[in-house]
């Protein structure tokens, strides 16, 4: 990583695209924490720069605060301390575009992750299209990730 000029590697386990699902990576990895942990361990072992994770608040039947907190806690064991969290779950069967609009946004779920893990760096993502929304989110989390123009 660093030898190529990168200062951080972010593993996106929040991508719901059909291609990603068929390859058992992306959001699929949120359903297989053992495999994800193994991947992160191998990556961490070979990196001298920070490794972060982008995820969703859930995927299909894997949802709710308990799932998300268990997911985050499991990755803490692998030394991950920065999370980019898309504030909606992914739904299999929806294309990527519809996965950005049909599942409802649940910003409070991301805020609760920060409340439960104040030492983690939590960056919120999803449906943020105005500067005022960015400013509001920063009252609850450490950063805002924009995927679209504002």
Where are these predicted regions, by residue range?
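Flavin-dependent oxidoreductase catalytic cores
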Residues: 1-150
